[in-house]
């Protein structure tokens, strides 16, 4: 009595299909699959870039690499309304 039987789950599935439709459920499934694939690819890329970052600069050492973006940065002051 604590868990649902197979018949309860089939009725819930039937109601969900009737409410959302099969096309919308298919789109949700493909979106979820794409998100999981993107997450896995991101984890693989993150692990490989983390390994290369630790070998290039020792921990605790700060490097200053000036780029073209540093030359175009404008320093401004924010004015607060009172």
UniProtKB/Swiss-Prot annotation:
- Chief place where the protein resides: membrane
- Biased segments, Basic and acidic residues type: 72-82
What's the protein's topology in the membrane? Single-pass membrane protein
Listed GO biological process terms: protein transport by the Tat complex
Q: Which GO terms describe its molecular function?
A: protein transmembrane transporter activity
Q: Does the keyword Transmembrane apply?
A: yes
Protein family membership: Belongs to the TatA/E family.
Function as written in the Swiss-Prot or TrEMBL entry: Part of the twin-arginine translocation (Tat) system that transports large folded proteins containing a characteristic twin-arginine motif in their signal peptide across membranes. TatA could form the protein-conducting channel of the Tat system.
Q: Tell me the HAMAP family matching this sequence.
A: TatA_E
Q: What is this protein called?
A: Sec-independent protein translocase protein TatA
Q: Source gene?
A: tatA
């Amino acid at each position: 009595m604590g868990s649902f039987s197979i018949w309860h789950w089939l009725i819930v599935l039937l109601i969900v299909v009737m409410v959302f439709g099969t096309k919308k459920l298919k789109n949700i499934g493909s979106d979820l699959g794409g998100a999981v694939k993107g997450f896995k690819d991101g984890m693989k890329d993150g692990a490989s870039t983390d390994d290369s970052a630790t070998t290039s600069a020792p921990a605790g050492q700060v490097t200053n690499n000036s780029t073209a973006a540093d030359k175009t940065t404008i320093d401004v002051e924010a004015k607060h309304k009172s």
